[in-house]
Amino acid sequence: MRTFHREARMPESIPASLIIDTLKDTFREARAARAAEGWGPSPHEHLGWILSVPDTHQKTVLAALDKEQAIRVLTCATEDEACTIAAGLHAGGEPVVLMIQHAGLYASVNTLRGVAMDGKVPVFYMIGLLQREKDKDPKESRHSMVRYCEPLLDTFSVPHARLEGPNDVHLIPEYYRLSRQRRGPTAVLVGLETS
C-alpha cells in the first residue's frame, strides 16, 4: 500500500484556478494515454468529467467549473451514483474525477469496494476534509469524520495522499495515474477549503 505522509506543516488553502489547471493537464494526459491504447478521437471537445456530490469544502472549485467549458461537471445525488457513473464513463474511455466530502466516503464504502475494488475500476477521488482543524494532523482531529478518513482508506488498502497546499497539486495527476495503473481506487484528501 502506498500512503504519502510528510512532516507536519501548516496546511494552506489551494486556489480553485490551480486545481482546475491541474485537472485540465491531468485530463489531457489521460486522453493522450487512451489514444496510445488505440481509442479513437473524442467525439466532443471537453477534456474530462468531474462527478460531484454537493461539497462545501471544494465549493470554489465547483463554482469555477460551472464557467469552465473544457471540463464537464455532473452533480450526482449520492456518492454511490457518482462511483457507478464513473465506472461507465471509464468504460467509454472518458477521464473522470470524483469530488466528494469525507461523509460521502463513509456513505459509499460498499460501492467503493464493489465497483472500484472488486470491479477493478480506476476511480480517483478528491475528498474534502470538512471541519479539519488547521493546526492538527487529521488523525488527531476532534471530529471523528476527519479522524477516521485515512484509517478507513488504509483498511481498504486505498492509496491516498494529503493536499496540504499549492505545492501538493502534483499529487492529483500522480494519484490519477496510480488509479489507472492499479485498476482500482485512489484518493487525495483536500485538507482545507479551497480558495
Where do the language-model regions lie?
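Thiamine diphosphate
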Residues: M1-S195
